[in-house]
């Protein structure tokens, strides 16, 4: 990427589960939090916490805070629940990413950091599995 002026990078960690979406921006080391907003902070109803609309509002808030602080570009780390649970990001992940891109922040790298076990503990559901 050729840029005429230097970019100030942060790391946007998007955790998209099926119950909520977190958009958390830190500095490059990850030690200092710049902004953290969840879908549940943006909507009234519990059922809407993980919705794409709530994730979009959360990402817009975070982007505004980043611009105040002086961050102009972000690397994105997208994460699902992982472990013994689902490894696909929830419905808010994609829209949070899109909202960050549309807000004027430059996007550096996009990485999936969902925890995948090499050999994990036993999954919830018992011997005969979940019966529908």
Curated annotation (Swiss-Prot):
Keywords, comma-separated and alphabetical: Cytoplasm, Ribonucleoprotein, Ribosomal protein
Biological processes per GO annotation: ribosomal small subunit assembly; translation
Disulphide connectivity of cysteines: none
PROSITE patterns: RIBOSOMAL_S11
InterPro entries documented for this protein: Ribosomal_uS11, Ribosomal_uS11_CS, Ribosomal_uS11_sf
Residue segments, region Disordered: 110-132
Localization per Swiss-Prot or TrEMBL: Cytoplasm
Cellular-component GO terms for this entry: cytosolic small ribosomal subunit; hyphal cell wall; yeast-form cell wall
Sequence ranges of Basic residues compositional bias: 123-132
Pfam families (UniProt xref): Ribosomal_S11 (PF00411)
MF terms in GO: structural constituent of ribosome
Recorded family membership: Belongs to the universal ribosomal protein uS11 family.
Job description of the protein: Component of the ribosome, a large ribonucleoprotein complex responsible for the synthesis of proteins in the cell. The small ribosomal subunit (SSU) binds messenger RNAs (mRNAs) and translates the encoded message by selecting cognate aminoacyl-transfer RNA (tRNA) molecules. The large subunit (LSU) contains the ribosomal catalytic site termed the peptidyl transferase center (PTC), which catalyzes the formation of peptide bonds, thereby polymerizing the amino acids delivered by tRNAs into a polypeptide chain.
Subunit structure: Component of the small ribosomal subunit. Mature ribosomes consist of a small (40S) and a large (60S) subunit. The 40S subunit contains about 32 different proteins and 1 molecule of RNA (18S). The 60S subunit contains 45 different proteins and 3 molecules of RNA (25S, 5.8S and 5S).
Alphabetized PANTHER family for the sequence: 40S RIBOSOMAL PROTEIN S14/30S RIBOSOMAL PROTEIN S11
The protein's name in its UniProt record: Small ribosomal subunit protein uS11
Species of provenance: Candida albicans (strain SC5314 / ATCC MYA-2876)
Gene name as annotated: RPS14B
